[in-house]
Amino acid sequence: MSKPAMRVAVTGAAGQIGYALLFRIASGEMLGKDQPVILQLLEIPDEKAQKALKGVIMELEDCAFPLLQEVTAHADPKTAFKDADVALLVGARPRGPGMERKDLLTVNAQIFTAQGRALNEVASRNVKVLVVGNPANTNAYIAMKSAPDLPAKNFTAMLRLDHNRALSQLAGKSGKAVAGIEKLIVWGNHSPTMYPDYRFATVDGQPLAKLINDEAWNRDTFIPTVGKRGAAIIEARGLSSAASAANAAIDHVRDWVLGSNGKWVTMGIPSDGSYGIPEGIIYGFPVTTANGEYTMVKDLEVDAFSRERMDFTLKELLEERDGIKDLLK
């Protein structure tokens, strides 16, 4: 007997990341090869965007995916999020010429306040929300604060792209296969201030730090390379990283829904006060996932260098939060 379909809402659905994401969701890569899906796709109420969305839907139809039960187009979050089991908030206002970061925060605060309120009103009470649109941690915080009737733990931000980028760099440096590396962490904000931390990482069960015993490489090459990878891709491609971002979103939700089989993964989640991170801040932490829930990996040792890096990325998150505080009243 087939499972009941899961409703997946995706915002910014006609954008680059949306285009790289939707076909993989519809093929069963995110929720399982036996899980039917209904896609509820949101775009801005602009004629060009809605027309582009119709084109994407035509292509989805033309794939004849066995798991795709229905696809609908929306311009209003209140219809797009109706009964959603999963919501991928991909659409956000990109930084335009001459825009300061605080201007970007203000514009996105309006978008994510409206979307948080709509989720609060119409989504499933168990909805799993992943914010991909930048600044992802603070946008997730805004949506969470705008949805007081939903559990705070339902709101997450995407650090998985940083996690995957760090995995790839470590595999290259150690000469080992990426699949063998476990227990990597990316702490903090999805921004160049993030702290990728491989102190606990293993490769094929052995400590990775024994293979890469190089503090200068860690500080001067590894951390900046992971932090600035997005900018490097824009420089090379002329466009932002869309396929790798979509891939990370699939990884994040797949592990959240289907479980990580005991492996550590990085998710931006509301802090419970652990590791000196103030409660409620959406911060990248190591988690394991099972039965549709994530559990933070606790009581890891924090050395002086790590404390400094963790506090540095926290400072940025607190500044972002303070920048939008008045907009949440």
Curated annotation (Swiss-Prot):
It catalyses: (S)-malate + NAD(+) = oxaloacetate + NADH + H(+). Substrate binds at residues 95, 101, 134, 165. It holds the Pfam family Ldh_1_C. NAD(+) binds at residues 12-18, 108, 115, 132-134. GO terms for molecular function: L-malate dehydrogenase (NAD+) activity. GO terms for biological process: malate metabolic process; tricarboxylic acid cycle. Keywords: NAD, Oxidoreductase, Tricarboxylic acid cycle. InterPro entries: L-lactate/malate_DH, Lactate/malate_DH_C, Lactate/malate_DH_N, Lactate_DH/Glyco_Ohase_4_C, Malate_DH_type2, NAD(P)-bd_dom_sf. The active site is at 190 (proton acceptor). Its EC number is 1.1.1.37. Belongs to the LDH/MDH superfamily. MDH type 2 family. Catalyzes the reversible oxidation of malate to oxaloacetate. This is Malate dehydrogenase. It comes from Bordetella avium (strain 197N). The gene is mdh.
